Amino acid sequence: GQTPREALRESGELWSTFSSVAAKNPHAWLKRDFDADAIMKPTADNRLIAWPYNKLMVANNMVNQGAALIITSLARAHEAGVPESRMVCFVGGAAAEEPRDYLVRDQFVESHAQNAVLGTVIDLVGGDGTAFDAIELYSCFPCVPKMARRTLGFRADVQPTVTGGLTFFGAP
């Protein structure tokens, strides 16, 4: 377990990593590299939203971006002229859900659904949760990527995002 102070520090450091990536992303909504202390400290511009999260630790509700993913066969992609460098090959997938009523859940320190999905993903990559070229641990709040890093067995120095995350990169 962690003390609240330790958990806040880990969240600030993780979100600082996300902001560093977003600062270099030309498509990011908030291109600024924040250090962990700036993310953790409540200020007029970084007010407390819901304990323990300040504004710089939650989804940015002022962003209105969209994206699309088209899934097709390799032959069809070639016919459409999609360059190989823009293709992503899916080797599998997984889905699960938690009870929508969080009061029904048996605990709050981990997610059974997340563990099931990430366990399936780890199996798909041969049992090594660190075997990814790139990963995006996207979430409204730091707690979900923190749990995912633990489930995947990531060290703190593993890059958890390629976009900059929901706070800094943005989303619909």
State the predicted function of each range:
Residues 1-76, 83-171:
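Conserved "HGTGT" condensation-loop signature of ketosynthase/thiolase-family condensing enzymes
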